[in-house]
Amino acid sequence: IAQATEFIESKKDGFDEYVEEKGTSLSGGQKQRLSIARAIVKKPEILIFDDSSSALDLVTEAKLYKAMREHINDTTRIVVAQRVATAKNADKIIVLDGGVIVDFDTHENLLASCEVYQDIYNSQLKREGDSNE
């Protein structure tokens, strides 16, 4: 689910690999995927992801959230994100502007009616391209 298996198995000792203090032997994305895996294994009622996939590329991030949608149905997931690609598959999205909630709806409805969301979406679309995952 956390998209960590491939890079773990590529390590010399695989799942027995020693990780240095503060994870200095890992990339930022690898650290994030291990942290997510550790949280998922605990099977909590609520998972809060506060920009926890910001170091992941868009493809890995899309795979991560798709796997969570498919395999973690009994856990409430709250995702704090700056990328529309991260938030667009959520049941509901809260849009903040200057720390104030300006809208709360689905991706499709926000695209149709929320100027702040439209601006964010359009600026990110130009920078990153539209991820359809």
What are these regions (language model features)?
Residues 5-34, 49-52, 56-59, 126-133:
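ABC-fold ATPase nucleotide-binding domain signature/coupling loops
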Residues 8-14, 66, 88-133:
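C-terminal portion of ABC ATPase nucleotide-binding domains
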Residues 70-81, 87:
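Conserved catalytic loops of ABC-family nucleotide-binding domains
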Residues 41-45, 74:
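A short, proline-enriched helix->beta-strand linker immediately N-terminal to the Walker B motif
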Residues 27-28, 34-39, 63, 79:
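ABC ATPase nucleotide-binding domain "signature" region
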Residues 61-73:
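Helical segment within the ABC ATPase nucleotide-binding domain
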